[in-house]
Amino acid sequence: MDTPRVLLWAIFLISFLWDLPGFQQASISSSSSTELDSTKDVENRKGGKMQRTPQESAEGRTPKEHRPRPNELRRRLPGQSLGQEPPGRGPRVVPHEYMLSIYRTYSIAEKLGINASFFQSSKSANTITSFVDRGLDDLSHTPLRRQKYLFDVSTLSDKEELVGAELRLYRQAPPTPWGPQTRPLHLQLFPCLSPLLLDSRTLDPQGPTEAGWEVFDVWQVLRPQPWKQLCLELRAVWGELDARDSGARPRGPQQSPPLDLRSLGFGRRVRPPQERALLVVFTRSQRKNLFTEMHEQLGSAEAAGAEGSWPAPSGAPDAGSWLPSPGRRRRRTALSSRHGKRHGKKSRLRCSRKPLHVNFKELGWDDWIIAPLEYEAYHCEGVCDFPLRSHLEPTNHAIIQTLMNSMDPGSTPPSCCVPTKLTPISILYIDAGNNVVYKQYEDMVVESCGCR
């Protein structure tokens, strides 16, 4: 075969192989990767985008907690530096371990499909509010015969059903033994300036004198009327109690004066925050929209501030930060339009449950929500076209509407892919009075989707 014919066959073979996709891809990948990267950089610059690695993105972005939010700038007072608490506001609330344990227990129960209101400890309540004792130490050196506990309960709403209330007092280990006493020791709780005995506890003087919590039922004093300030008084006496006496005083000739409560471990001095007296109120409220309820809390906080009560917490967000501003609406519209373009054929998938991760910190709610800071809410997405699947549990109306849409799409819109089953989650947050609240919010997680 002569040389011209060989060259002709070689040119023909190369041109044939070049048209094959695999050969062309191999040829491109064997070329310089630097040239390809530089081409991508040029294209990204033209589109106004710069590619960065995740590490570079994190380092190049100012941390969210260090950036002032618009509502935070509005709340700053003249001469107040960023991050400094306004005058009159206390330090950031530290949740009591009891409230944290309630949240942990009920959250685990919800994941197992058990409603938290079924627990006996919840008293069938969906809201549990804790109030920390605001009383001051008795600095005198005289025996402490009566220990008073003060609580600001002005944030309690008369629209909620009160189903229980208890006072939790931590009894520290006594510094000295009680002595060779054979009579029982009675702890009695009264409303301040009232002879009405609310509850009592009996301690065995011969038993172990270990530290622990004493729990008193105070539902009786909160039930008749909503209080703004609640004052409770603790006393301790030896001897048998006369059940016929409304004051439940000791009976018999061996009556002794009330004991020094400090010697029993009820003094306030050198007491860490987790051992302070705690008033826990159990209420049951009707189902509310999350935003509506928070608006009501802001309104009550502003009213309380006008009356000269304790100020609202620094963590309570402004109402404007919850509502969609025009800028947010435009941004959401732009995102939704990009979303539609990006999905293309994927948007034609049938109605089903899709992931939706909610991060309260990204929403700017981490300054008043304690836990959880994030959760999986899910959402419903997809089309409801004919024929509808049985697992979508369509209503009769949805079936007819889908059938009409399949016959004439221009006359009838298709049925919508919406949640058909929603479940609650537990949220631990700080209310307008700086109190730690556990609440079970309904309709927070999508469990199933259907066509409606």
Curated annotation (Swiss-Prot):
Residue ranges annotated as propeptide in the record: 23-332
Cystine crosslinks: C351-C417, C380-C449, C384-C451
Protein name: Growth/differentiation factor 6
Compartmental location: Secreted
Gene Ontology biological process: activin receptor signaling pathway; apoptotic process; BMP signaling pathway; cell migration involved in metanephros development; epithelial cell migration; fat cell differentiation; metanephros development; positive regulation of chondrocyte differentiation
Region annotation Disordered: where it falls in the sequence: 29-93, 244-267, 301-348
Region forming the signal peptide: 1-22
Pfam families: TGF_beta (PF00019), TGFb_propeptide (PF00688)
Main function: Growth factor that controls proliferation and cellular differentiation in the retina and bone formation. Plays a key role in regulating apoptosis during retinal development. Establishes dorsal-ventral positional information in the retina and controls the formation of the retinotectal map. Required for normal formation of bones and joints in the limbs, skull, digits and axial skeleton. Plays a key role in establishing boundaries between skeletal elements during development. Regulation of GDF6 expression seems to be a mechanism for evolving species-specific changes in skeletal structures.
GO cellular component, one term: extracellular space
The keyword Ubl conjugation belongs to this UniProt entry's keyword annotation: no
Main subcellular location: secreted
PROSITE patterns (alphabetical): TGF_BETA_1, TGF_BETA_2
GO molecular function: cytokine activity; growth factor activity; identical protein binding
Biased composition (Basic and acidic residues): 37-46, 58-75
Compositional bias per record (Basic residues), positions renumbered to this chain: 327-348
Family: Belongs to the TGF-beta family.
Glycoprotein listed as a keyword: yes
Residues annotated as glycosylated: N115
